[in-house]
Amino acid sequence: MARATEIITGAESTNKLGYQCLQHELVDGFFNRINLLVASQAIKDRVARAEKTLDELRDPVKRAMKLWGIGSDAVSRMETECERVCRDPGERKLRRFCDMITSVFNLMRDRGGMRLEVFQVELMRGFFIGIAANQFRDDLFKYKHIILDLLGLATPDIVAFNPFCPSMDTGREINRIFDEYGKNYTLALAPRQCGKTTIMVILLAAMISYLDIEIVVQAQHKTMCETLYDRVELVLHEIQHSPWYPEENRIVTIKGTTETREFIYDPAYKGTTRVHFLSSSPNAARGQIPDFVLIDEAAFVNPASLLSLLPLLAVKNRKQIHISSHIAKSWVTRVETIMGSDGKRAFHVINQRFKCDGHAHLPGMMCPCSAVFCPTHIDLNESIQELINNITPGGCELELTGGDGAGVLKRDVATPFSEELVRQFMTNAVPDLSGVKRVFIAVDPTYANGTQSSFGVCTFAELNNGMFLVVALEEVAIGEMRSILMHFYTTVLMAHVDYILGIINRKDIPIIFLPEQNTFMFDNETLWSHLSGAAERKFGIKLLVYRQFNKSGTTEIGKLVSGNKASMVIKVHNMMEADMLGRVMTVASFGEIVKGLYLHNKHVISKYYRADTVKTITDARDAIANPRDIEDFKKLPPADSAEYIFRYLGGTEVSVAHGDDGIFKAGTELVTRLGCELMNVSLKSVGRTVKVITGGKRYQGGSYSRDDLFSAFLLGTSMMGRPDDATDGLFIVT
C-alpha cells in the first residue's frame, strides 16, 4: 500500500485509492481535505487489519491453519510486516510522554491535592511543550493537539483536531500556543519561597522516569547541587513506588557521582537517562551536549557559566529553563524586552509579582491586581516590610514581593550614556576633515609598578564650528613594555602626530599634548621632553603642551580631573545629545602594532643571545641592575643579557608602515570598546558629592576590565567649548 502522505512533484498524482488526481484538483483545498481524510482513514484501517492479523497469529489453532495453508516462511513474513505496520515509534514516545504528564498530576493528587501557583502552571507548560520538539522531532505535528489537551490548553476544536485532515484555523491556533510556550528559552522570575525549585524538582523527576534525555542542572555552588540532587532523588523514589507506576519500569540501578548520574532502566522500557548536577564555574558545562538545561537562581550564577550554556540555544530542539528570584538592575529583568523579528517576545518569560507596575508607587506590599499571586503560606505585613527596609531601603519590595526595587535601592544612581546615545555618537561619522582648528592628543598614561592599567590615548580634531571628532584611539596593556616605557609611549604618540599631519596635510595646525595629571609629574615631564624633541627632529614642527595653573599660581603639565569628573561626564552627555561629538570614518590605532614590533625585536635579541625564554618585566623593580662594566655584562645569564640590551637600545627603532591597513581595523575595534566603556559609566550620589563609577580595574573572567580609553576620551572632551582666553591653563611650547 502507498505511504500515508506523499510529495506532489508533477501536474498529476495518484491518491491512496488509486484515483489519478488532475492539476485543478490538486490546488482545490476542499478536494485536498477530502483526500487527506480518506488517506487518514486508510491508515487507520490498515493498522486495524494488521492488529487483527497479529491477534489471529497469536491464537495457536489459527496459526497452525496458516502454517498449513501458506507455509512457515510466508507466515513469518506476514508477522514481520504486520509488526512493522503496528510498530510506530512515535506512538510509543507519545504514550511515555503522556504518562509523564499524567504522573505529575497523580503525584500532586497523592500529596493531598497540591495546588499550583499561576507561575508554576505556566512553568510546567513551558517545560512540557518546550521538550516536546526534542522527543518527537518531525512527528510532533501529529501529537501537538494531544499534548495541549493534557495541559489544559485545548479548545473543543483542538481536542477534535485531525493532523492528517487539518482545519487551517485550528492548526494556526495550535501552532500559536506551541510557539508561545515552546520557545527554546524560558525564564521564570518569582519572589522568594514561592515554589520555583519545588515544581522543577517534580518535573525533573518525572522526566528522568519516562524520557530518553540528557540533562544539565546548574546552581551557584556544589552544596546547592547536592541538595537539588537529594530532592530529585526523593521525588523520583516517590513516583516510581506509587501504585500507578508500573513496577517493571522502575530504575534498575544508578551509577556515577553527583556531577554525572546515570539512571539505568530495562532496555525494553527505555534507554539510560544522564543528569549532570554542576556548580557554577566558567567551564563546568563545556563539552556537555544536553537536551535540557535547568539553572537555579540564574541571576546569581557566575556570568561566565551562563556564557558556556546559552550558546547551546542556537542548537535546534534544545530547551533551557532559568529560574530566579528578582534582583534589581540584573540582566534577568531585561530579557522580556528582547523582541523577535516578528515583533513579539523572543523568549518565554514568566514574571510573578505581588504588586504590579501601576501600583508600585503606593504603600503596602501587595496591590488588588496581583495579591492573588501571593501564596497562602506567605504572610506579608507592614512590620516585616519596615524591618527589612530598615536594613536596605526597598529590600522588602524586591526580595519578598517581586517588585522592582531598583528605583528605591538605586535612585541615587544615573547612567548618563545609554545605548541609544552611544549609538548616536558612534554613527555621527564625518567622511573627511575640513576646517580643523586644532588637534588634542589626550593621554591617560601609567607609570606605576605592578599596576593593571593600560596606556589610553584619544586624539581629537576640533573643527571651526566647535565639533570634536575622534581621529585615533589607543588602549594597550603595558606589562611587556615596562623596560622601555618612555620609548614605547613616544613611538605610539609620534605615530598619532604622523597620522594627523598626513590626513590634514598641514603643519600650521596646533597639535596639543594633553596628559592627565597624576602623582608621577616628573614622568609626564620626561614623556613630553621625548615627544616634543622627536616631533621637531622628524617633522620640523613644535608641539604644544597644556599646563594647568595650581593653587600657588605656577603651572603643572597636564590637566587634573579628579575633582571635576562628574561635571565633565555631564558635559560629554550634553555634547553627544547635541551631535557635537563624533568621529572620522576611519579611526586609526597604532599601539598594538607598535607593541608587536617591539616584541619582535626583543625576540630577535633573545635569539641572538641564545636565551631559552624571553624575559618579560611586568614590574620595574624586577629589572636587573645596569652592569658596571663589560665584565659584569659577561656574567649575566642569556635572558638578562637580552633584556639589558633591549632596554639599553630602547627596543631599537620601529615604525608603522604607511600602507598598513591594520591600523583601521584596530581603530574600529577600539571605537566599539569605547562605546562599551561609555555604557558602563554611572553617576552615584554619595552624601553631597557625585561619584563617577567607570567599572574599570575589576577582575572578571580571568582578566581586569579597563577604563583607560574612557579616561583619555573624557580628558580630551574637557577642552570642548574652551574659549581662547580661558584662564585655567596655557597651551605653550615648553
Swiss-Prot record:
Q: Which UniProt keywords apply?
A: ATP-binding, Nucleotide-binding, Viral genome packaging, Viral release from host cell
**GO MF terms held by the record:** ATP binding
Q: Does the keyword ATP-binding apply?
A: yes
InterPro entries xrefs: NAT10/TcmA_helicase, P-loop_NTPase
User: Which residues does ATP bind?
Assistant: 190-197
Origin superkingdom: Viruses
* Keyword ATP-binding (UniProt): yes
Disulfide bonds listed in the record:
none
This protein's name? Probable DNA-packaging protein
